[in-house]
């Protein structure tokens, strides 16, 4: 009589991730795996890092192990337990799936209850017969790139005008800075709060826009940059009582070429920056072409390390029309964009008017509002009070030369840029218990302490909420309305931690 093959030798099973994972969230049998709200579109998934948070004894009841068993990659009593591999398998499945989108990528440091937030996408995956297999994925990638050039969004070239003064070229080739140590900039003070901001979406004359957007700024007496290293419990109320200590002008910028590792840097210029790809240098005589010279000039990385020849060709097609660039401008506590370049730019973010999968373009030479710190603080207060179900968004995504948002995953776009206002991220991480502090973690800059009364009131209210949370004891039951504070995570706390 033939004996059945050992379980460990059985081939892995093909399992549809979406129905299986949705069923597991509904089952409530895995600690921390639960819906964010009643709409069942967003869910928390615990994401503990064993190397950071120490060993855990909850590994026998995790969604990662369940997925390994479901797909036949782990058999109890036969295979050796490997929680790290289980986690990697599920992470890869989520990243490849079109049914899920990562909304919140988890903490940067060591909170007591780390997690991620995923969205269940309404757009289902492509039919099985159209899904590329591993064998022909590279071939289909080449075919897809071959079809991209006619669809690239580049503004029609304008008729040449009067001859301009010769461009000045840099003396040396510009090297990509993020391969070096991230820059630390001692910034001059930010523009005063009395500057008036034109209504977003209104076209403006170039000279008028730039004179209003970026007035000459002279250092003020007493302006200083301070490195602080107190404990998190001491620093948080200090920052909320003295909001001028927050890096309000800092932006984290992350460049991403399709399929390539992202390259990131932090900008600390209070007049912000211009994203460009060119060896032409901005001069005082060419403000209408390239914007003010006081902007930090941030160049896109070279595409030369893109291995695919076709992808590199199409990427260069877009970079070649990014000479004039995209200006990111901080005015007061708001972030704006002005598109100068011929390459069309699409975006998504907190202030985007288009919702869902409808493309959202940035009109050329029109100031577009991207982010409002005041609105973010209002939403953060409501979230901490339990009056809203999700934390306020603050990340901004740009897609160059292709429509966005649309049904195509962001990872498939040729050129994308993510922009994060550092102050917003810090505030959310503080109230999530996700931010650890060290002497070299951040250089906090004091530049303009005269903030509007309304913003001061917002910080005072946030400070009051934080103090109230310190007196709360951890609860043993899952809260009806999960929050992100250090004292109350989105799932019950366990004495031995979570795997």
UniProtKB/Swiss-Prot annotation:
Keywords: Antiviral defense, Cytoplasm, DNA-binding, Immunity, Inflammatory response, Innate immunity, Isopeptide bond, Nucleus, Phosphoprotein, Transcription, Transcription regulation, Ubl conjugation. GO terms for molecular function: DNA-binding transcription factor activity, RNA polymerase II-specific; RNA polymerase II cis-regulatory region sequence-specific DNA binding. CDD domains: IRF. Residues 121-142 are annotated as: Disordered. Phosphorylation of serine and threonine residues by IKBKB in a C-terminal autoinhibitory region, stimulates dimerization, transport into the nucleus, assembly with the coactivator CBP/EP300 and initiation of transcription. 'Lys-63'-linked polyubiquitination by TRAF6 is required for activation. GO terms for cellular component: cytoplasm; nucleus. GO terms for biological process: cytokine-mediated signaling pathway; defense response to virus; immune system process; inflammatory response; innate immune response; positive regulation of transcription by RNA polymerase II; positive regulation of type I interferon production; regulation of transcription by RNA polymerase II. The modification Phosphoserine is found at residues 153, 294, 302, 432, 436, 438, 441, 447. A motif (Nuclear export signal) lies at residues 145-155. Transcription factor that plays a critical role in innate immunity by activating expression of type I interferon (IFN) IFNA and INFB and inflammatory cytokines downstream of endolysosomal toll-like receptors TLR7, TLR8 and TLR9. Regulates the transcription of type I IFN genes (IFN-alpha and IFN-beta) and IFN-stimulated genes (ISG) by binding to an interferon-stimulated response element (ISRE) in their promoters. Can efficiently activate both the IFN-beta (IFNB) and the IFN-alpha (IFNA) genes and mediate their induction downstream of the TLR-activated, MyD88-dependent pathway. Belongs to the IRF family. Homodimer, when phosphorylated. Interacts with TASL (via pLxIS motif); interaction takes place downstream of TLR7, TLR8 or TLR9, leading to its activation. Interacts with MYD88 and TRAF6. This is Interferon regulatory factor 5.
């Amino acid at each position: 009589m033939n004996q059945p093959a050992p379980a460990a030798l059985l081939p892995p099973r093909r399992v549809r991730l979406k129905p299986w994972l949705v069923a597991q969230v509904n089952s409530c049998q895995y600690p921390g795996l639960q819906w964010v709200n009643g709409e069942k579109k967003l869910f928390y998934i615990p994401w503990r890092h064993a190397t950071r948070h120490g060993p855990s004894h909850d590994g026998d009841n995790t969604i990662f192990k369940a997925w390994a068993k479901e797909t036949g990659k782990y058999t109890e009593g036969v295979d050796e337990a490997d929680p790290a591999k289980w986690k990697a398998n599920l992470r890869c499945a989520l990243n490849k799936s079109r049914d899920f989108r990562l909304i919140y990528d988890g903490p940067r440091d060591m909170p007591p209850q780390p997690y991620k937030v995923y969205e269940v996408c309404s757009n289902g995956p492509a039919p099985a017969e159209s899904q590329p297999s591993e064998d022909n994925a590279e071939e289909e990638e080449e075919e897809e790139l071959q079809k991209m050039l006619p669809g690239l969004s580049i503004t029609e070239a304008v008729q040449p005008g009067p001859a301009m003064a010769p461009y000045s070229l840099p003396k040396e080739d510009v090297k990509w800075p993020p391969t070096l140590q991230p820059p630390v900039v001692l910034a001059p003070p930010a523009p005063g709060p009395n500057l008036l901001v034109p209504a977003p979406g209104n076209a403006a004359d170039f000279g008028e826009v730039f004179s209003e957007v970026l007035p000459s700024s002279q250092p003020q007496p007493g302006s200083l940059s301070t490195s602080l290293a107190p404990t998190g419990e001491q620093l948080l109320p200090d920052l909320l009582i003295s909001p001028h200590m927050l890096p309000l002008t800092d932006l984290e910028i992350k460049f991403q070429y399709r399929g390539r590792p992202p390259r990131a840097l932090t900008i600390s210029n209070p007049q912000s920056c211009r994203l460009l790809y060119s060896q032409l240098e901005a001069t005082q005589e060419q403000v209408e072409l390239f914007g003010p010279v006081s902007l930090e000039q941030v160049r896109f990385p070279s595409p030369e390390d893109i291995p695919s020849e076709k992808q590199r060709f199409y990427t260069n097609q877009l970079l070649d029309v990014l000479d004039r660039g995209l200006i990111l401008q901080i005015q007061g506590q708001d972030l704006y964009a002005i598109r100068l370049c011929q390459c069309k730019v699409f975006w998504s973010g907190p202030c985007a008017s288009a919702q869902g999968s409808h493309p959202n373009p940035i009109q050329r030479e029109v100031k577009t509002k991207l982010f409002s710190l005041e609105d973010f603080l209002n939403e953060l207060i409501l979230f901490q009070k339990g009056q809203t179900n999700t934390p306020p968004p603050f990340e901004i995504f740009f897609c160059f030369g292709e429509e966005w948002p649309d049904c195509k995953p962001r990872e498939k776009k040729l050129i994308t840029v993510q922009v994060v206002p550092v102050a917003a991220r810090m505030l959310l991480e503080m109230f999530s218990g996700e931010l650890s502090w060290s002497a070299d973690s951040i250089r906090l800059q004091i530049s303009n302490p005269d903030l509007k009364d309304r913003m001061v009131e917002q910080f005072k209210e946030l400070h009051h909420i934080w103090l109230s949370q310190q007196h709360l004891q951890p609860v043993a039951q899952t809260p009806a309305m999960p929050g992100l504070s250090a004292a109350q995570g989105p799932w019950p706390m366990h004495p031995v931690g979570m795997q």
